[in-house]
C-alpha cells in the first residue's frame, strides 16, 4: 500500500454530470455597420465576450474583418460574384463602425471567365490614394473577336499584350491615385475602371470581361476618428444649424 493513501475513504462517484454554463450567456451582440458608400448599411451581428476586468470588449472587436457579398451591400444580385472585406475601426455603443479593407472575386466566377481560344491579360498596380492608403489592384481582361471576324481564335500577339498591360497600368494608376479610398470604392462598385480600360484598348485589340478582380490593402494611415465618422455619415460635433420653422419678426415697443 502506497504511503498517503487510505482505502477506507470513499471515492467520488464517476459519471456525474458537471454543471454546464452556456458560453453565449457571457457574450454580447453588436451590430456591424458598413460605410455610407454602400446602399445597405446593416451588415449583420457579431458576438464578443463581455467586458470583464482588464479585458475590454471593444478591444476584442477592433480589427475584426468581415467578408460580405457586394450583392447584399448593394441589394443587387448582379454583384453576387464580388466579395468585400470590411474592417472594424471603431466601436460606438453597440455599433461596430467598419471601413473598406479589400475586394475579391468568387472562385467560381474567375473559373467561368477563363475559356479556350482567347488570351488572358493580367496586370497589378501598387498605388497610394490621396488619403494615404496603400493599395494593390489586380486587373484581368480577355480578348474577343473583332467585328466580322471569321477566324475561330482571338489570340493577341506578345507586343499587343504588352501594350494592353501598359495601358491598363496607366489607367488604374491615374484613376486610383487621384481620389480617396471612399471615392475609389464608389468607382469599383459600378466597375468604372474596367469600362475605361475596355474603351481605351479598342485600337490595340478588342477586350471583354475587363474587371478589377482584387483589391488588397497593404498599409493604412494613422487612424482618424473624424474621417471614419464622416464616412458613416456621423460627426463628433454638431456643426450644422437647425432650420427655423417660422420667420422671425422683431417686436417693436410702442412705449418705453
Curated annotation (Swiss-Prot):
> This protein is called what?
Small ribosomal subunit protein eS1
**One cellular component term from this protein's GO annotations in UniProt:** cytosolic small ribosomal subunit
On this chain, the residues bearing N-acetylalanine are 2
InterPro entries per the UniProt record, alphabetical? Ribosomal_eS1, Ribosomal_eS1_CS, Ribosomal_eS1_euk
Which one GO biological process term can you cite for this protein?
A: translation
Q: Which UniProt keywords apply?
A: Acetylation, Cytoplasm, Ribonucleoprotein, Ribosomal protein
Renumbered to this chain, the Basic residues biased-composition regions fall at: 1-18
